[in-house]
Structures are given as structure tokens and as C-alpha cells.
UniProtKB/Swiss-Prot annotation:
This is Small ribosomal subunit protein uS2. Belongs to the universal ribosomal protein uS2 family. Keywords: Ribonucleoprotein, Ribosomal protein. The keyword Phosphoprotein does not apply. CDD domains: RPS2. GO terms for cellular component: cytosolic small ribosomal subunit. Gene3D superfamilies: Glucose-6-phosphate isomerase like protein, domain 1 (3.40.50.10490), Helix hairpin bin (1.10.287.610). The lineage of its organism: Bacteria, Bacillati, Cyanobacteriota, Cyanophyceae, Synechococcales. InterPro entries: Ribosomal_uS2, Ribosomal_uS2_bac/mit/plastid, Ribosomal_uS2_CS, Ribosomal_uS2_flav_dom_sf. One of its GO terms (biological process) is translation.
Amino acid sequence: MAVVTLAEMMEAGAHFGHQTRRWNPKMSRYIYCARNGVHIIDLVQTAVCMNNAYKWVRSAARSGKRFLFVGTKKQASEVVAQEALRCGGSYVNQRWLGGMLTNWTTMKARIDRLKDLERMEASGAIAMRPKKEGAVLRRELDRLQKYLGGLKNMRRLPDVVVLVDQRRETNAVLEARKLDIPLVSMLDTNCDPDLCEVPIPCNDDAVRSVQLVLSRLADAINEGRHGSNEQRGGDGSEG
């Protein structure tokens, strides 16, 4: 059975690409036609790629691979967190901080600091500090939770990065490729399929398109790990 149907993709608007003047010629094999100055993605190709991506991700999960979901644009942010948590993955959905992968030692120290501050907040230790000092600590806690909260349970570098919007997440792509971490990428018509191992050509701007793709990938991870793609009430922790 197909991972996703043409009707589901049409309803989600997954076929709408960018204006023709903004295209990347390397995406031509995934483009069906142009209408009113906008490229239309070939959803038959997308369905094939989704099937391949599902099998690839399921196999990776079955072998114990760890996943990091990345998507910081407004329309993807909530979905990225939701689906990453549902399958026990980690996520970045606010801003990619330089060195999140390539300077992992420093990043892990910041994550440890976040955990320390959360323990202090839970125990009431921050509330017991002088007012000014407590305010400084709470601001630091809020900032770390915003940018690193999705990485809190990522104990080491991920084995796979699942990406929404390759063009926006350039730094994430560069860091993953530098470390030879494979990328599963949603690719709009302005993207470069050569910069990922597992391409999924589709509209990466529409919320429903992003939701459709990420939910299927989360299903694949759950199926690989647990033998079922049912929702798991995970906390984002990975070994």
C-alpha cells in the first residue's frame, strides 16, 4: 500500500512549487509542468520518493539510529516539534545556532546548563535568589529552553537529520554534510537534490504539506523501533 496517496498530497497542496524564475534546474526531474508562472511538482514522483523515504527511515530506526528534525520557519515550527516528540526524536524549530552539530561539545555544555537551570527552577532555588539574580537566571532559562529545548534529551550527535526547507536551513545542511550525517529532505522546486541522501520533492511552505510528510516519517520511525506506527507518548529521548 502506498505511504501517501495522490489525493492526500493534492489536498495538502504538496504539488505547488515556487515561481518558475526561482527554480533550481536540478529539480527538473521532479517537475510536472508550469502553470501561471509557478512550477507544479510531479506527485507521482513524490509518491515514489515518499515510499523510498519511508522504507529508508524505517530501516534506520530499526537499526537504532537517532533522528534530529529541523525546521525553523513559522509554518513548520509546531509540526516539527510535534512529530519529533511523537517518534522519540530531537528537534530544532526556532533558530539554528552555529555549531549545533560541528561544535557539539560546546552545545552539549549549554544543554547541560539548561538542565541545571530547570532543576533549580523546579526545586525553588531560583526563587530563593535575590530578585535581580533570579530574573537573570530566568531569562537565561527561557532563552535556552527556546533554542535548545528540543535537544535536551539528545545525548550525542544524531545519525539522521530530517529537514524542512533546505534553502532556509543552509547551515544545518552544511554541518550535517561536513560530519557525513545523512539528510532526509523535503525539497521544493528551488532546492538542490544533490545535497541530501533521501529526497522528498514537495511543497515545503504549506503547513498541511509539511504535516503530511513529517507525520509519515514519524510513523516510519515508530514502526522501525516498535513494529507499529501508532503514536508513542515519548519525551524526545534517544539513547
